[in-house]
A protein has these predicted regions:
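Basic amphipathic alpha-helical segments that dock to polyanions
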Residues: 10, 41-50
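Short alpha-helical segments that sit at the start of domains
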Residues: 1-13, 17, 74-75, 89
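Amphipathic alpha-helical dimerization/coiled-coil segments
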Residues: 78-90
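Short, cationic-aromatic polyanion-contact patches
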Residues: 3-4, 58-80
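Glycine-centered, phosphate/nucleic-acid-interacting loop/turn motifs that mediate DNA/RNA or nucleotide
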Residues: 51-57
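Short acidic, hydrophobic short linear motifs in intrinsically disordered regions
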Residues: 20-30
């Protein structure tokens, strides 16, 4: 599984948090980024499709509920898998 630079930045926030985060949480913890809410939504969907993250439940925010996400592997597992797959490409 190869991730884009922006996807890796999302993964770094998730790995560093140590807990499931919502889209709003990701935006709050990435204040130095100029991501829009819709951009984070697209990045999260891409990470879900690649199997890098999974839905970990729902959290209530004011009057609505939002999904929270967590990584499917540790940072170390991701890099080990990436290195292994690059070494064994035909």
């Amino acid at each position: 599984m190869e991730l884009t630079k922006s996807e890796m930045e999302i993964m770094d926030v998730l790995w560093e948090s140590g807990q499931p985060l919502s889209r709003s949480d990701l935006l709050e913890r990435s204040e130095e980024k100029t991501w829009k809410d819709s951009s984070v939504h697209i990045l999260l969907n891409g990470l879900l499709q690649k199997g890098a993250i999974r839905e970990a439940g729902l959290v209530k925010r004011s009057k609505t509920y939002g999904r929270v996400f967590c990584p499917t592997m540790t940072r170390e597992e991701y890099f080990a898998t990436t290195i292994f797959s690059h070494r064994h490409k035909p």
